Amino acid sequence: MRIVALAGGIGGARFLRGLLAAVGPQDEITVIGNTGDDIHLYGLKVCPDLDTVMYTLGGGIHEEQGWGRADETWSIKAEMKEYGVGPEWFGLGDRDFATHLVRSQMLTAGYSLSQVTEALCVRWNPGVRLLPMSDDRVETHVRITDEQGTRAVHFQEYWVRLHAAVDAEAIIPVGADTAKPAPGVLEAIAEADVILFPPSNPVVSIGTILAVPGIREAVAAAPAPVVGLSPIIGGAPVRGMADKVLAAVGVEATAEAVALNYGPDLIDGWLVDTADEHAVAAVEAAGIACRAVPLLMTDVEATAEMARTALALAEQVRHGS
């Protein structure tokens, strides 16, 4: 079975770990990773979501944080601070720095982000084919109003420095409108047997991937069933700031509203948590097959069961049952 998953960072990576546990060695998983979170720091290109997927599936992630490297040290950051060089609010550890140095060196030498990502994955052996959504530069910005007035800030600043404490007024995936899907992205979607939307942020993760011209259209036109898992449980995000960015695009922070925002033209099936069982009827009335099942990724086995349920729903959709 050929499975394609569109994924952001922590939530996407943890779901993918469960998916790997749920499938067999004969199954092929292609992950189309969000690069809208990418940021340039200290002259280096940092790809937080790609790296989180790579580290998580490769066994190098800081489990408690869900991002960054295990057994990290911070000597470089401390030295940068002594030079008065920031930003202090964004933590890059020494081990993590090495990844960004290799990436930036290869990009400067003329390799594409796709080629660099493939090379980095040779070390980590994540068990999936990891593709960036685009080789072109796309960065998600958030329009806010604070004591400095109305302005746009990089998504990383909005989330890491401001902790999403200010309302998001608009989400702007800068560069997405002129970006092209990375090599292999459209082909993977067209050839997939199943397409999955993990419980990643529907606006700044999956939404940004879909903003690259051609990707949304390819998913909508794909013969494979498309099944998503709600990142919202009981009217609140499991983690992160999905409620803030959903409000910015005029969508309620409910499992039902997120499904309807994707729409029946894009997704065929939708899983909600048992806490949101009341949403099933409304989602199905819109033409999207819906089931209520436990969606908390408490451990790998619980997550694997979520993945198995998503794949089972895809089969039901495929056979019209």
Curated annotation (Swiss-Prot):
One of its GO terms (molecular function) is LPPG:FO 2-phospho-L-lactate transferase activity. InterPro entries: CofD, CofD-like_dom_sf, FbiA/CofD. Its cofactor is Mg(2+). Pathway: Cofactor biosynthesis; coenzyme F420 biosynthesis. The keyword Membrane does not apply. It catalyses: enolpyruvoyl-2-diphospho-5'-guanosine + 7,8-didemethyl-8-hydroxy-5-deazariboflavin = dehydro coenzyme F420-0 + GMP + H(+). It is an enzyme of class 2 (transferase). Pfam families: CofD (PF01933). Its EC number is 2.7.8.28. 7,8-didemethyl-8-hydroxy-5-deazariboflavin binds at D51. The keyword Metal-binding does not apply. Keywords: Magnesium, Transferase. It comes from the Bacteria. HAMAP family: CofD (MF_01257). Catalyzes the transfer of the phosphoenolpyruvate moiety from enoylpyruvoyl-2-diphospho-5'-guanosine (EPPG) to 7,8-didemethyl-8-hydroxy-5-deazariboflavin (FO) with the formation of dehydro coenzyme F420-0 and GMP. Belongs to the CofD family. Homodimer. This is Phosphoenolpyruvate transferase. The lineage of its organism: Bacteria, Bacillati, Actinomycetota, Actinomycetes, Kitasatosporales. The gene is fbiA.
